[in-house]
Every structure is written in structure tokens, then in C-alpha cells.
UniProtKB/Swiss-Prot annotation:
Subcellular location: Virion; Host nucleus; Host early endosome; Host Golgi apparatus
Function: Minor protein of the capsid that localizes along the inner surface of the virion, within the central cavities beneath the L1 pentamers. Plays a role in capsid stabilization through interaction with the major capsid protein L1. Once the virion enters the host cell, L2 escorts the genomic DNA into the nucleus by promoting escape from the endosomal compartments and traffic through the host Golgi network.
Name of the protein this chain belongs to: Minor capsid protein L2
Protein family (similarity comment): Belongs to the papillomaviridae L2 protein family.
GO BP: microtubule-dependent intracellular transport of viral material towards nucleus; symbiont entry into host cell; viral penetration into host nucleus
Pfam families for this protein: Late_protein_L2 (PF00513)
Motif Nuclear localization signal: positions: 1-12, 442-450
Processing and modification events after translation: Highly phosphorylated.
Gene Ontology MF: a single term: DNA binding
Protein keywords: Capsid protein, Cytoplasmic inwards viral transport, Disulfide bond, DNA-binding, Host endosome, Host Golgi apparatus, Host nucleus, Host-virus interaction, Late protein, Microtubular inwards viral transport, Phosphoprotein, Viral penetration into host nucleus, Virion, Virus entry into host cell
InterPro entries with a match to the protein in the record: Late_L2
Entry's Gene Ontology cellular component terms: host cell; host cell endosome; host cell Golgi apparatus; host cell nucleus; viral capsid
Length: 459
């Protein structure tokens, strides 16, 4: 027995369900958004329309009506038909043209002729004219007189010019026949413009020179006494000449004590001076004054720690050695003049004006001893004798007289060189190779002097 299939009943549409279930609140979840146009597609169009305008295309979820203007049928426009026939000309208004002046310009134009002094032409009258004649008794004789020519020369002095006249007038000379003149030249008044002061000086007296005085910049100070440096005083004098002896053993090849010194220690070692332990670098020396002392300073770098990259980490130490104190003098020494106060003349032939001595006689000078005795040449007050030491060799003598003749030593035997023992003939050297003398193998190099200041030390 065949079973009859149950008839399927059509489900109500969303609009019908919305009308019955909206009030009771039993609508399926997809009915209300579809009827109220609140689906995801509607929300996309709603929020996208804020930034995009499609005009009147009518894009939406409603019926496809083509928007407010409807659809335009897609058909080609018909071509306009061209009919053959006579073409009528448009009416043209013809304006009358009047004749104008000719455009031809004559190249030859008559000039106006003015006859000054000619008799005026009187037009004839209709009634005719009358001719009047008279006899002339005065003969036509011209008065011929002798013509005299006058020449005038004018010379200007370029040296002299009147100061008050800016543009002098040309000279004017006149006589009975010639007159030379020129228009008057007037000078314009000079406009005075006050000068503006651009440089403002604070001093009342004003600047004394146009070139400013350059300021003296302070000299940079080396930070030898900062907190980052450890101060160590050295008492060994070898620190001045060979500081490497205080750190490592003496190296005879080393030269130059005024440069930076570097040391490399491969193993643990003891320095000759404990103050220079683990020193890997000594910077250049510097000489300065500190509290009345002349101080010789060097900056040292310790290598207490070594990293794998080869970098050394350590403290910086300031080594200094006081050379000598700068003390003031304990007492002041008065300077005395080297020349005596009296103006004495040490002349062995000076005349004496003392009483009891004949002025025509010369003073007696005893030269048997090694001293000469002289009397000063004074008039007002006698002074004591001045003894001048004079040493005379045994082979020299003095000759009396107004002049002193210096003795001459006898000439000795002329020197004659000894004949050399080497052969005097020509010397020939034959050979293909030569050797340099051992003294020239190592030529001493000139050491470059470097100023004593820290060029590689941070201040």
C-alpha cells in the first residue's frame, strides 16, 4: 500500500512573519534586519556612502528602477539627413564708403620763403593806377671808407682761480666793432646732509684707533690636579732623563726622553720603583710652576685590567718631581757704581799744581817695581794719590818721551814643513769593488725636538 506523501506547506515570507512576530518578540534573527534594511550589506552601503557619492545611479537594495531619472536606452543617435538644394546667402549690409584723401605723400615740399625788407606788393585797383615821376638831383655815389681790422688776444692763467666762483664766466672783451658775450652761469646751492654715526662707543672719549684691540684669550690649563688623577711625587732624579729605568730594564737602543713612552708587559713583573707598577704609557713631560716650585710632570696610564678585545683599563696617575724652589732673596744688595766719585786723571805725564813742585817738571815715576804712582790733576782741593797696578814683563821696557812706543818682539825662525815620507808621485788605484768603512755603517740620526707640553693628554 503506497503511502501518500505529506503536502509541503509554503513558509510565510519575511514580511508576513515580521507583522505577526514583531509584537510578540518571537521573530527569527534574520527577519527583522532584512525587513528594516539593517543587514551587513546595508550597513556597508550606509557607512560607505559617507565617503563615496554615486550620484543618481540608484545603487541599493531596493527595486531596480534606475534612480530618479530612470534608465536611458542604449541606442545610437540618428545621423542628420542632408538635403540637396540651392543655398541661400545670408543678407550682408553694404556700407557706403566716401572718398578720402590720397595716401601719396609728396617728397619735395616747397619751403616758406620770407623776403625781409622787400617792398610790399599792392594789388591793383579796378580804377587803374597813377605813375608819378620826379627828377633826381643827388648823384648815386657810395661813401667808401677805409676798413680797419682789430685783433684781440685773451690769455688765461691756469694757476690762479678765484675760490668763490665755482664756474667762472668766460671773459668779455668789447671795443667799437666786436662784442663777445656768454650767458651767465649760476651755481646751485650745495645740499648739506648730516652724517650718521654707526659706531656707538660706551666710553666718553671715543675710540682712539680704527683697528680694535684683539682680546687676549686665556691659555688652556692642563688638568694635572683634578680628581681623576692620582698624585704621586717622585724623588728619583732618573725620572727627569730616563723614566723607563723606573718601569722596566734599561734599553740601550731607546732614545728620546721628551716623547710619550709605551710599555708592553707580557707577564707579571716587578717594577724597579713600586710607584710605577703596571704602567703601560707615560705621556710627554711638562714643566710648570706650582706654589713657588719648578715642577717636572708626566701623566701615566696604568694597565690594571685587560679585556679580550685588547683594551687596557686602569687609573691615570700624575707623576711630578720638584726640581728647585723659587724663593725670594733674603736680603737686598745695594748696587755701587764701578767708577769713583772724583774725576781723577790717571796720566803719568800730568802736570801737578801743588805748591812746592815746579810745574815745568814732570813727576818722577818709579818703574822699578810693579806699581805706578800718579798724582791727580786738581786745582781746588788736593786729593790722595791713586795707585794703579801695572805688571810689566821682564822682556819689555818703556821709553820716555811725549809718546809711548810699544816694543816689538823679535821675529822667530820661519817654519819649514818636514818632507812627507809618503811617495810624491802619482797613485793609481785599480779594482772593481770597494767596502765602506765600518764607521759609516750606522749614521747617527738627528733627533727631532718636540716642545714640552701635553699634546695627547685631555685637560
Amino acid at each position: 500500500m503506497a503511502h501518500s506523501r505529506a503536502r509541503r506547506r509554503k513558509r510565510a515570507s519575511a514580511t508576513q512573519l515580521y507583522q505577526t512576530c514583531k509584537l510578540t518578540g518571537t521573530c527569527p534573527p534574520d527577519v527583522i534586519p532584512k525587513v528594516e534594511h539593517n543587514t551587513i550589506a546595508d550597513q556597508i552601503l550606509k557607512w560607505g556612502s559617507l565617503g563615496v557619492f554615486f550620484g543618481g545611479l540608484g545603487i541599493g537594495t531596493g527595486s531596480g528602477t534606475g534612480g530618479r531619472t530612470g534608465y536611458v536606452p542604449l541606442q545610437t543617435s540618428a545621423k542628420p539627413s542632408i538635403t540637396s538644394g540651392p543655398m541661400a546667402r545670408p543678407p550682408v549690409v553694404v556700407e557706403p564708403v566716401a572718398p578720402s584723401d590720397p595716401s601719396i605723400v609728396s617728397l619735395i615740399e616747397e619751403s616758406a620763403i620770407i623776403n625781409a625788407g622787400a617792398p610790399e606788393i599792392v594789388p591793383p585797383a579796378h580804377g587803374g593806377f597813377t605813375i608819378t615821376s620826379s627828377e633826381t638831383t643827388t648823384p648815386a655815389i657810395l661813401d667808401v671808407s677805409v676798413t680797419s681790422h682789430t685783433t684781440t688776444s685773451i690769455f688765461r692763467n691756469p694757476v690762479f682761480t678765484e675760490p668763490s666762483v665755482t664756474q667762472p664766466q668766460p671773459p668779455v672783451e668789447a671795443n667799437g666793432h666786436i662784442l663777445i658775450s656768454a650767458p651767465t652761469v649760476t651755481s646751485h646751492p650745495i645740499e648739506e646732509i648730516p652724517l650718521d654715526t654707526f659706531v656707538v662707543s660706551s666710553s666718553d672719549s671715543g675710540p682712539t684707533s680704527s683697528t680694535p684691540v684683539p682680546g687676549t684669550a686665556p691659555r688652556p690649563r692642563v688638568g694635572l690636579y683634578s680628581r681623576a688623577l692620582h698624585q704621586v711625587q717622585v724623588t728619583d732624579p732618573a725620572f727627569l732623563s730616563t723614566p723607563q729605568r723606573l718601569i722596566t730594564y734599561d734599553n740601550p737602543v731607546y732614545e728620546g726622553e721628551d716623547v710619550s713612552v709605551q710599555f708592553s708587559h707580557d707577564s707579571i713583573h716587578n717594577a724597579p720603583d713600586e710607584a710605577f707598577m703596571d704602567i703601560i704609557r707615560l705621556h710627554r713631560p711638562a714643566i710648570a710652576s706650582r706654589r713657588g716650585l719648578v715642577r717636572y710632570s708626566r701623566i701615566g696610564q696604568r694597565g690594571s685590567m685587560h679585556t679580550r678585545s685588547g683594551k687596557h683599563i686602569g687609573a691615570r696617575i700624575h707623576y711630578f718631581y720638584d726640581i728647585s724652589p723659587i724663593a725670594q732673596a733674603a736680603e737686598e744688595i745695594e748696587m755701587h757704581p764701578l767708577v769713583a766719585a772724583q774725576d781723577d786723571t790717571f796720566d803719568i805725564y800730568a802736570e801737578s799744581f801743588e805748591p812746592g813742585i815746579n810745574p815745568t817738571q814732570h813727576p818722577v815715576t818709579n818703574i822699578s817695581d810693579t806699581y805706578l804712582t800718579s798724582t791727580p790733576n786738581t786745582v781746588t782741593q788736593p786729593w790722595g794719590n791713586t795707585t794703579v797696578p801695572l805688571s810689566l814683563p821682564n822682556d819689555l821696557f818703556l821709553q820716555s818721551g811725549p809718546d809711548i812706543t810699544f816694543p816689538t818682539a823679535p821675529m822667530g825662525t820661519p817654519f819649514s814643513p818636514v818632507t812627507p815620507a809618503l811617495p810624491t808621485g802619482p797613485v793609481f788605484i785599480t779594482g772593481s769593488g770597494f767596502y765602506l768603512h765600518p764607521a759609516w755603517y750606522f749614521a747617527r740620526k738627528r733627533r727631532k725636538r718636540i716642545p714640552l707640553f701635553f699634546s695627547d693628554v685631555a685637560a
